[in-house]
C-alpha cells in the first residue's frame, strides 16, 4: 500500500510538473537564453563557468513562479522586464548554491560535479560573487527602487540565514523556532520575492501583491519541509545531490529535531555521524525506520501540506485564471515531489 501511495504521489507530481512548466515553457526558454546572456563575459574563465552552471540545469521553479505570478494578475509574462527579472532570481539562487556548496564541501550539484569540486573553492567563491553582481547589475537597469529594495533585503536575509546556520553546525540543541528562522531566511524569502516581484511588474494592487508575497513564503516553507524529508528518504540518483547529506554536514533538520525529542539517547550516535562525516553509528535506513516508527515523517508531511493550504488560501484574492490554477498546482508538485 505504501509503495502504491509513493508511486501515485510521484505520478501526480510528474504530471503537474509537465502542466506547470508546459504552460510557461516558451517563457522559460527565454529565461535560458537570458541566463546565457547575463552569465556571459569577455573574460574567458567567467564565460566558461557561466555556461557550466547554466548547462547544469535545475527545475527553474523560481523563474517559473515569477512568470506565473505576473500572469496571474494580468501581466504580460513574456515582457522583456519579466524575463530579465525571472533570470535574476535564478542567478541569485545559483549564486547561493555555489556558495553553499563551498561551505558544505559538497561534490555534487544537479547530478554534476559542483563548481568547487570541479574548479576549486577560490574560483567558486569568486564566481558566486560575480553572479550576485551580475544579477544586481541587471536589476538596477529596471530603475525600480521597490524591486531593488526587495532584492537587497532578500540577499541580506539569505546571507544572515547562512551565517546563523554556520553557528549551529554540529549542534544538536537546535530548537524548532531556530530551524524555521533559518528556513525562512535561506529558502522561503526567495520564493516570496519571486512572487512579489512578478506582481509588481504586472502593476498589481497592494492586496494582490501581498497575497502573492504570502503565497510565496508559505510555498517556500512547504518546499523546504519536503526537501528535508527527501534528504532522509530519497536516493542520490533522484535528488541530483548526495542523499542524507544534511546530517553529514552537521545540519539538524526538523525530522531529527523531532526524533531527538522522542529518542534523546540517540544524541551520541548522531554526534558521531556528524563528527565522522559518515553514517557509522547508525545507517540512514536505521534513522528512516525510527522516523517512520514515531510517525515523524507523516507529521512533517502534514506540516508541509498545512503550509501549502495556507498558500492556496492566499490566492483567493486573485481572479480565477489558468495561471492562478497553475500556482495552486505548484503546491501539489512541491509537496508530492520525489526530487
Give short role names for the model-derived ranges.
Residues 1-339:
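All-alpha prenyltransferase/terpene-synthase fold signal
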Amino acid at each position: 500500500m505504501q509503495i502504491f501511495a509513493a508511486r501515485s504521489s510521484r505520478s501526480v507530481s510528474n504530471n503537474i510538473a509537465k502542466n506547470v512548466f508546459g504552460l510557461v515553457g516558451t517563457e522559460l526558454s527565454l529565461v535560458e537564453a537570458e541566463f546565457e546572456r547575463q552569465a556571459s563575459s569577455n573574460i574567458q574563465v567567467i564565460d566558461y563557468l557561466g555556461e557550466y552552471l547554466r548547462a547544469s540545469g535545475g527545475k527553474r521553479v523560481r523563474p517559473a513562479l515569477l512568470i506565473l505570478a505576473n500572469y496571474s494578475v494580468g501581466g504580460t509574462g513574456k515582457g522583456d522586464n519579466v524575463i530579465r527579472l525571472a533570470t535574476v532570481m535564478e542567478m541569485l539562487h545559483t549564486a547561493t548554491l555555489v556558495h553553499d556548496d563551498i561551505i558544505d564541501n559538497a561534490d555534487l550539484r544537479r547530478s554534476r560535479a559542483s563548481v568547487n569540486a570541479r574548479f576549486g573553492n577560490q574560483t567558486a567563491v569568486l564566481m558566486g560573487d560575480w553572479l550576485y553582481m551580475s544579477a544586481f547589475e541587471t536589476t538596477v537597469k529596471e530603475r525600480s527602487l521597490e524591486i531593488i529594495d526587495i532584492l537587497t533585503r532578500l540577499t541580506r536575509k539569505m546571507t544572515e540565514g547562512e551565517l546563523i546556520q554556520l553557528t549551529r553546525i554540529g549542534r544538536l540543541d537546535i530548537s524548532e523556532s531556530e530551524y524555521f528562522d533559518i528556513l525562512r531566511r535561506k529558502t522561503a524569502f526567495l520564493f516570496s520575492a519571486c512572487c512579489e516581484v512578478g506582481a509588481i511588474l504586472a502593476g498589481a494592487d497592494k492586496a494582490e501583491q501581498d497575497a502573492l508575497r504570502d503565497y510565496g513564503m508559505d510555498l517556500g516553507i512547504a518546499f523546504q519541509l519536503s526537501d528535508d524529508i527527501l534528504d532522509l528518504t530519497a536516493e542520490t540518483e533522484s535528488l541530483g545531490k548526495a542523499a542524507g547529506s544534511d546530517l553529514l554536514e552537521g545540519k539538524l533538520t526538523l525530522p531529527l529535531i523531532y526524533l531527538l525529542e522522542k529518542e534523546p539517547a540517540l544524541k551520541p550516535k548522531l554526534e558521531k555521524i556528524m563528527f565522522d562525516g559518515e553514517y557509522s553509528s547508525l545507517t540512514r535506513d536505521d534513522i528512516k525506520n525510527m522516523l517512520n516508527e514515531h510517525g515523524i515523517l507523516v507529521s512533517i508531511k502534514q506540516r508541509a501540506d498545512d503550509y501549502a493550504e495556507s498558500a492556496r488560501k492566499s490566492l483567493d484574492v486573485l481572479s480565477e485564471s489558468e495561471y492562478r490554477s497553475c500556482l495552486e498546482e505548484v503546491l501539489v508538485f512541491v509537496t508530492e515531489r520525489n526530487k
